[in-house]
Amino acid sequence: MSAAQFEARARQLLPDYATAYFGATAGSGVSDAESTADWSAVRFRPYTLRDVSTLDTATTVLGTPVRTPVLIAPMAQQLAAHDEGEAAMARSAAATGTLLGVSTHAAVPFSAVAAGGAPWWFQVYVTRDRHLTELLVERAVANGAAALILTVDMVALLPAAVNPRSWADVPGRARMTNLTPAELAAAGSEGTAIDPTVTFDIIRWLHQLSSLPVVVKGILRADDALRCVEAGAAGIVVSSHGGRRLGPSITPARALPEIAAAVSDSVELYADSGLRTGEHIAAALALGARAVFLGRPLLWALAAAGSEGVKAVLDELTVELELVMTQLGVARVSELTSDVLETPTQPVQRSAIHQPPAFG
């Protein structure tokens, strides 16, 4: 089954509240739709007469080797998709040879994620009660997390008036399973909320707390990227939160080139939001990303077919990437650079494409 077929199957199997939550976008959904469209709009300049008999999609992310540059994004409420949640996702990552992000709102214990055998990074929402964040980070470190993903683009949930779907309530959903009921009760709903006062200083604080590299997720501006670097970030995820942050925001495909030029090689760059094909992944790598994070397609696959479904989608996209590499004349993902892209000095009059010839 393809990713699209897994999604269709998942929508048949899941209750409405789950499909509404998983598919929710901000506002009218324009950012989500444009994210995919902008990856599709990237144009390539293929090499010819290159030896592509042996292809290599392997790379490293913050020193961790992976067999594919397609990583698993941190996603909440995975128990609503599958009764093993992130534990099943972790097994898929291990079987594929990739890495996964694990949400602050993970539905299973960190120990169950670690048992899956894949390298993993812990995604952090900094809470108003800072002690809760400290506890979560310490427990993630104790269970083998190799890095922290600091999500900075979701300061508050969008009000239901903006998009009722974004507030879909998943019955029985897990909230911060890696905190005890007593810890959650002591903090209250106010303490578990995202802290809107955090600034760039939080990057250094998290690094000092954990001794782990900190990857900042949700950057769409070059000046913000530079400030993250100055604050000690080891990586940046150029992301629009899958279109769930702000309806008319800039897309990662548009933001990535500027950010890549600004930070140069000072940090590793990653991208997410709207990536659906091997061509999209190749475009992101050529625009400056070292790897990409994939979200919803894997969540739908998890719901439709468990860990095997997730692995099937990851394998499918990696095979698609290999095909694109073959057609571009590059044998290794490290060769996917701006050299294979259309440049501003080679404009294409898109409106003229596919127009019928004029006669008379």
Named regions from a protein language model:
Residues T60-H105:
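Active-site cofactor/substrate anionic-group-binding motifs, chiefly glycine-
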Residues Q77, A90-R91, R128-A271, G278-W300:
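Alpha/beta enzyme core
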Residues G329:
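Active-site-adjacent helical/loop segments in soluble small-molecule enzymes
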Residues L71-Q77, P119-Y125, G188-S189:
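Short, basic, glycine/proline-bearing loop/turn elements
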Residues A94-T133:
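A gly/proline- and charged-residue-enriched helix-loop-helix capping module
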Residues M325:
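An acidic-aromatic loop/edge-strand motif
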Residues M1-V66, A160, A168-T199, S334-L336, ...:
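An N-cap/entry alpha-helix motif that binds or orients negatively charged groups
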Residues S35, T251-A262, L302-E322:
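C-terminal helical cap(s) of enzyme catalytic domains, especially alpha/beta-barrels
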